[in-house]
Each structure stands twice: as C-alpha cells, then as structure tokens.
Amino acid sequence: MQFTLAAAAALFGASALAAPASPGSTGAPPDPNMYENIDIADFNVRKGEDGTIKYVNFKLSGDDADGLLCEAQNPGLPSNVITCGESKYRFALSSGKQYEFALSLYHELGLAVGFYGTGEIFTHCRAGGLGDFICQQQNPTTIVIDSLPDAPAEA
C-alpha cells in the first residue's frame, strides 16, 4: 500500500512539474509603463425601438483622467472613433460577443503612439419612454489597454 501511494505521488508530482508554463509567462510582473487600466462607470445607452443608438455616455478613469465624461449623440453601431471632451482619450461603440455592447478605448500618448484595447460592458435594458430603451451598466468594468497587437480572432 505504501509503495502504491508513493508511486502515485511520484507520478502525479512528476506530471505537474512537466506541465508547460502558460504562454508568454516569464514570471516577471508586467511593466506598468506598457499598459493602462481604464475604469468605466455610469455607462448608459439610449436606443430606439428599431435598435438605433441615440445616445451613449460613460465616465472614464485612467492614468490621465478621473471621471472624464465620454458621450455621443447618434453614434451608430458600430460607431466612428469619438473623442472624450478635450482629452487624448477616444472610444468607439460596437456590438459585443458575450454582452450587447463593447467599447474600444484609445489613449494617445504621442504622435502616432498610444494604447488601445476593447472590452464588453454588461448592461440591463429597460423601457425608457417614448418607445426608447435605456441600457445601464450593471457591474464595475476595467478595460486594459496597451500597445500590443490584438490576438487573432477565434475561428
């Protein structure tokens, strides 16, 4: 019995040691100068009965912004890239895969240099009057933006 337990422990221990590390894992923490965490709060979309987006707004907080208002009237879906106020932050609204809406965020850091990333926003939609629907963010959301190329699309 002791031999069986020892053999099993050795076998499972060896297989755990032989397991490959996750791709791209070097063990070192990521360089904080190579990415930015963007917190999204108070995300709201007003859409018509036909699904057209009439208005989108949210607050963005990142390295160079705290509660920056981002908004657009009749942005379309997907939207063009829209500047948040007079800042170097921009966004585009699109359809998500898991949730109804996704945000692509951009932070211009210099001439043709910046961070970019996309994340989905979990919303709940309800009647908003005059045949419209109001969709509001349900959970705190952080989108990580960086200068790395996007991962290949899944087949």
From Swiss-Prot:
Keywords: Disulfide bond, Hypersensitive response elicitation, Secreted, Signal. GO terms for cellular component: extracellular region. Disulfide bonds join C70-C84, C125-C135. Coiled coil: none annotated. It holds the Pfam family AltA1. Residues 33-148 form the AA1-like domain. GO terms for biological process: symbiont-mediated perturbation of host programmed cell death. InterPro entries: AltA1 (IPR032382). The keyword Plastid does not apply. Residues 1-18 form the signal peptide. It is found in: Secreted. Effector protein. Elicits a hypersensitive response (HR) in tobacco plants (N.tabacum) and cotton (G.hirsutum). Boosts systemic acquired resistance (SAR) to tobacco mosaic virus (TMV) infection in N.tabacum and to V.dhaliae infection in primed cotton seedlings. Monomer. Interacts with Arabidopsis thaliana NRP. The N-terminal region (1-98) is sufficient for induction of SAR of N.tabacum to TMV infection. The C-terminal region (99-155) is sufficient for eliciting HR in N.tabacum. This is Effector protein PevD1. It comes from Verticillium dahliae (Verticillium wilt). The gene is PevD1.
